[in-house]
Amino acid sequence: MVNKILDSVTIQLGKTFGTGYRYYVENVKQDLQTPCFTIDMLQPLERSRSKVLYDRTMPVVIHYFNDNQNTLKKDSYEMAERVIECLEYLPVDNALIRGENIKWLMVNDVLEIFITYRFTTTKVVDVEDSMTDLNQANINTR
């Protein structure tokens, strides 16, 4: 599911901003071509609600590297608004997941945008596997 979220974020950014930007999900140690976005998953969390229901939390950070040093802050502020609008609702597996706790800031002239996606998933459990742990007890004995 992590890769599906990252893929969907990348696709949405590509649809919104087009081919004039680079989109990186893997680390780039050198030769980062700007303007570009890097997309990372921070610390996903899964909590079990039952044997088949799981609450998932997927915090994503998007870094935007601007190539225009003359209007860096002004361009980055506008970019933050556009990215948030683009990623507020993320299509994944024929459903829309709404981003929450959206915030952004500038760090060392790089725009950082944080969005958390929360959703519930179900796990398919084979009925035969579930039935193997049942034991019959005589409830009429006192």
Show which residues each predicted segment covers.
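Short acidic low-complexity segments
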Residues: 24-33
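A short, hydrophobic beta-strand-centered structural micro-motif
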Residues: 33-41
